[in-house]
A protein has these predicted regions:
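Transmembrane beta-strands of outer-membrane beta-barrel proteins
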Residues: 30-34, 115-121, 195-199, 233-235, ...
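Transmembrane beta-strands of outer-membrane beta-barrel pores
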Residues: 36-42, 99, 121-129, 201-209, ...
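Residues on the lipid-exposed face of transmembrane beta-strands in outer-membrane beta-barrel proteins
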Residues: 18-22, 100-106, 181-185, 221-227, ...
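Flexible loop and strand-edge segments within Gram-negative outer membrane beta-barrel domains
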Residues: 1, 7-9, 13-79, 89-97, ...
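Flexible, surface-exposed loop regions and adjacent strand-edge segments
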Residues: 7-12, 47-57, 133-143, 149-152, ...
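Outer-membrane beta-barrel transmembrane domain signature of Gram-negative proteins
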Residues: 62-73, 133-237, 242-246
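Residues that define the transmembrane beta-barrel architecture of outer-membrane proteins
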Residues: 10-14, 94-100, 175-179, 215-219, ...
Length: 290
C-alpha cells in the first residue's frame, strides 16, 4: 500500500580493495589486485531532472504545496514538483561491480641479462537492477473562492490512485576479460650501444547486456637502438584483429619506423646546457588503420 513506501533519497555503498604483491623468488614476482562495491539506492520514481525542471518554472508564491484542506494543487499540465518528489511512489536500484587483476613477472636473466617475461589477466563484471513502483497523483485546482463555511471551492484536475501500480524492472550487466603476455629485452653494451625490444600479445573479450559481445586481439612489437645516447633508430609494428569484420579481413598489419638525433647531447651544445636542456630531432613514418 501507499503508506508502506518511502521516496526519500538514500544511498548505501560498500567498497572493498585489496592489493597483494608477492616475491616468490629473487626472479619471480606476483601481483593480485581485487576491488569492487555493492550499492543500494532509494529515490522517487521521477528523475531529478524532471523534478527540478518543474521547480524552476514556478515562483514560490504561484501555488501552495498543499491547500489548507489537504488537496494537492497543480499548474496547468506541469504538475507539482513537491508531489512528484514525494507522492508518486519509489524506485529502488542495486548495483555491484568486481574488478580483478593477476600479473606475473619473471626475470630471465639466467638466460641472458635484460630479458623479462610478463603476463596479465583481468576479469571485470558489473550488474545493476532497478524496480520502480508508482501511482498517479490526485490534483486539484482552486475554482471560485470559498463556500459559506469558509472552505476553498476546488475542482478536481486529475484523478489519482491510492495504490502503487505494477512494478517496472530494468536489469543491465556487462563483463570484460583481458589477457596480455609480453617479452621484454633491455640491455646496454660497452656503455654506448643501448638495445631494447618488446613483443606483446593481448586479447580482450567484452560482453554487454545491451549489445552484441565482441572480441579483439593483437600482436605488437618494438625494437630500438641508441648509439652513445645521441642517435636513435626504432621500428614498431602492430598486427591487430577484431571479429567485427568478415573472415579473411579481420586482421591488419601496421608498421612504423623512426630515426632520431638528440642534438642536446652533442659537444657543441654544452655551452647552452642551462638554456636548452633537451633538444631532439625526430622523423617517423608509419601506417595506421582500424
Amino acid at each position: 500500500r501507499s503508506l508502506d513506501w518511502d521516496p526519500t533519497i538514500k544511498l548505501q555503498r560498500y567498497n572493498v580493495r585489496s592489493n597483494v604483491d608477492l616475491k616468490l623468488s629473487p626472479t619471480t614476482q606476483v601481483r593480485f589486485n581485487i576491488g569492487g562495491y555493492l550499492q543500494d539506492r532509494n529515490s522517487s520514481p521521477e528523475s531529478t531532472d524532471q523534478i527540478f525542471s518543474r521547480a524552476f518554472r514556478f515562483t514560490p508564491f504561484m501555488f501552495p504545496v498543499r491547500y489548507s484542506s489537504g488537496e494537492i494543487p497543480a499548474w496547468q499540465e506541469e504538475g507539482n514538483p513537491w508531489a512528484m518528489a514525494t507522492q508518486r511512489g519509489f524506485a529502488r536500484s542495486s548495483a555491484s561491480k568486481i574488478e580483478t587483476l593477476f600479473s606475473l613477472e619473471q626475470d630471465l636473466k639466467f638466460l641472458t641479462p635484460g630479458l623479462k617475461l610478463r603476463g596479465t589477466f583481468s576479469f571485470d563484471r558489473y550488474s545493476t537492477g532497478k524496480v520502480t513502483r508508482s501511482k498517479t497523483v490526485e490534483y486539484w485546482n482552486a475554482a471560485s473562492g470559498r463556500n459559506e463555511e469558509g472552505e476553498l471551492i476546488l475542482a478536481q484536475k486529475q484523478q489519482g490512485s491510492n495504490f502503487l501500480g505494477t512494478s517496472k524492472s530494468a536489469e543491465y550487466g556487462n563483463k570484460s576479460i583481458y589477457m596480455e603476455a609480453s617479452l621484454n629485452y633491455d640491455r646496454t653494451f660497452v656503455d654506448k650501444h643501448a638495445v631494447s625490444a618488446m613483443l606483446l600479445f593481448n586479447r580482450r573479450h567484452y560482453d554487454d547486456g545491451s549489445a552484441l559481445p565482441y572480441r579483439n586481439q593483437g600482436l605488437a612489437g618494438r625494437a630500438s637502438y641508441t648509439y652513445n645516447g645521441k642517435y636513435v633508430a626504432e621500428f614498431n609494428f602492430g598486427y591487430n584483429g577484431t571479429e567485427n569484420f568478415a573472415k579473411g579481413k579481420r586482421y591488419g598489419f601496421f608498421p612504423s619506423a623512426a630515426v632520431g638525433w638528440i642534438v642536446s647531447e652533442e659537444p657543441f651544445m654544452q655551452p647552452l646546457r642551462n638554456t636548452i636542456s633537451k633538444l631532439k630531432l625526430r622523423a617517423s613514418y608509419g601506417q595506421v588503420g582500424n
